[in-house]
Amino acid sequence: MSGKTIFDKLWDQHVIAGNEGEPQLLYIDLHVIHEVTSPQAFQGLREAGRRVRRKDLTYGTLDHNVPTQDIFNIQDLISKKQIDTFTKNVKEFDVPAETHGGKGQGIVHMVAPESGRTQPGKTIVCGDSHTATNGAFGAIAFGIGTSEVEHVLATQTIWQVKPKRMKIEFQGHPQKGIYSKDFILALIAKYGVDAGVGYAVEYSGDAISDLSMEERMTICNMSIEFGAKIGLMNPDEKTYDYVKGREHAPKNFDEAVSKWEKLVSDSDAQYDKILSLDVSQLKPMVTWGTNPGMGLEFGEKFPEINNDLNYERAYQYMDLKPGQTASAIDLGYIFIGSCTNARLGDLEEAAKIIGDRHIADGLTGIVVPGSRPVKEAAEAQGLDKIFKEAGFEWREPGCSACLGMNPDQIPEYVHCASTSNRNFEGRQGHNARTHLCSPAMAAAAAIAGKFVDVRTLVTD
């Protein structure tokens, strides 16, 4: 009998009922909620006279609608209603949650790991597609719909069909100036935005082992843009070190680690598909079009029109042409933030590139830490001063300009170098034009006034 993947091990440990190949009932170890997808779920509980079954396994925060300047002055009526409703619901149902402007408030996919709630071996769900971020810890984590949010609140379980297993091997060691954001953008560009559909993706290889936990989260975060619902990695010493000492880390930590060490893929585990990517010669990545698969290494020419891939529409929307390169993009905005790249390490890398330089004339740059703990840690290092002296706006935590659900929207027809995860039409605002890249690449673009090869600015 062949060995098991980490995904198989975790799935089997959490199945309550059902046969393989059919929907199976899974027990959920952590349910994270935010203000956008939880209101209808709580209302459903209220109307049915139900309670939250496991309040101790539920955790909430505010992120999508929160302003990042005057955080309590919410002008948009829908945003205000969602925030007020969330605050009312978590109080009424006695659910642990970060308060608006509170010490732990931040993007949902950041505060769960930062608080120590995200741990190896867990099943984690949230009404948000980028929940896969938590898979970097060796957890099965995935996004769910609003009706499923209600089901988990009421039962602490969810029905799911087990996906197939894919292994992706990141081979080699990257050059300086190449980051995990480049890994995942290159993977999506190579294999496409649908390559992961129907799979739980396990990321492996020497290049993954070398990454910090923050960098690993970036890759798992964008599993969704690869088409997969679930992305995860085998836990190791870096995982345990990250969790250790955090508020909600296991009390008997050594005992927990002894269990976690068994939650790795066996050497003879079988996969339904195996893909690979050599990162040793990888160059910085930038997207040119309107989905994350429309990305190229810096210096490559934009491709000829391929109607099967909607290139013509993408070129029209982005106001670009085949044969151009990323350096020809007329940037007007720089956004460093989002659940993909707003962690302390991301801000540190961007600040290193900036140094004592100033952003180019005509550019607007905003830096939005993903959580209050990250903001405070960055300020303790003086990173906020580096950004502000360079001409960036230093904001309060939130989802910010990743999506057009709060005041931080990119102006119409403006090109934005963004460290977020999606470059769809209108994602950052009406007719906004998004170019995905790493934080260091965004910082380099801010200084130069256009996309440049960040490797020329890396000093250590």
Swiss-Prot record:
InterPro entries: 3-IsopropMal_deHydase_lsu (IPR004430), Acnase/IPM_dHydase_lsu_aba_1/3 (IPR015931), Acoase/IPM_deHydtase_lsu_aba (IPR001030), Aconitase_4Fe-4S_BS (IPR018136), Aconitase_4Fe-4S_dom (IPR036008), IPM_dehydratase_rel_enz (IPR050067), IPMI_cat (IPR033941). Keywords: 4Fe-4S, Amino-acid biosynthesis, Branched-chain amino acid biosynthesis, Iron, Iron-sulfur, Leucine biosynthesis, Lyase, Metal-binding. [4Fe-4S] cluster binds at C339, C399, C402. Gene3D superfamilies: Aconitase, domain 3. It catalyses: (2R,3S)-3-isopropylmalate = (2S)-2-isopropylmalate. Pathway: Amino-acid biosynthesis; L-leucine biosynthesis; L-leucine from 3-methyl-2-oxobutanoate: step 2/4. Its EC number is 4.2.1.33. Belongs to the aconitase/IPM isomerase family. LeuC type 1 subfamily. This is 3-isopropylmalate dehydratase large subunit. It comes from Lactococcus lactis subsp. lactis (strain IL1403).
